[in-house]
Amino acid sequence: MPKETGEKLIVQNKKARHDYAIEDKYEAGLALTGTEVKSLREGRASLSEAFISIDRRGEMWLEGANIPEYLNGTWNNHAPKRKRKLLLHRLQITKLARGIEAKGYTIVPLSLYFKDGRVKAEIALARGKKEFDKRQALREEQDKREALRAMRYANMRH
């Protein structure tokens, strides 16, 4: 079988982009079992309740991510919501650890994707948005959409 190349998106965490202001993005590998990878190849995953923690040993973990059991799996299947280790360089982990010490900052998973046949997680150092920030972002998005619609309508009339 030929080796995979390129990127293929599995799942995005749209709620994280809405609830947090993204500061820095990182790409992290994931330590997974075989049935987890097979389930991800079918596009079955959810990051809606996922969060990232750093333990005392300086290891990063993806927790709360739901990767359902592989349908054709046997007794060797995985637990859907188990902790999964994130693979990053030591310097990146220490930089992120220093970042979350600041008030209001956290690390959130943004997406899972395949890159050259390996599962990667896009994670970000993020600051929580206040309610008015969320409304402001929605308003700006809506204004942009209306402006595009008006320009399209004006172009059609000529």
UniProtKB/Swiss-Prot annotation:
This protein's GO CC annotations? cytosol
Q: Which UniProt keywords apply?
A: Cytoplasm, RNA-binding
Q: Looking at the record's lineage, which domain of life comes first?
A: Bacteria
Example of a GO MF term: RNA binding
Q: Per the database entry, which stretches of residues form a coiled coil?
A: none
Alphabetical list of PROSITE patterns matching this protein? SSRP
Q: Where in the cell is it found?
A: Cytoplasm
Q: Give the InterPro entries listed for this entry.
A: SmpB, SsrA-bd_prot, SsrA-bd_prot_CS
An individual GO BP term: trans-translation
Pfam entry (one): SmpB
What's the main place this protein lives?
cytoplasm
Of which family is this protein a member?
Belongs to the SmpB family.
| Task performed by this protein | Required for rescue of stalled ribosomes mediated by trans-translation. Binds to transfer-messenger RNA (tmRNA), required for stable association of tmRNA with ribosomes. tmRNA and SmpB together mimic tRNA shape, replacing the anticodon stem-loop with SmpB. tmRNA is encoded by the ssrA gene; the 2 termini fold to resemble tRNA(Ala) and it encodes a 'tag peptide', a short internal open reading frame. During trans-translation Ala-aminoacylated tmRNA acts like a tRNA, entering the A-site of stalled ribosomes, displacing the stalled mRNA.
The name this protein carries in UniProt is SsrA-binding protein
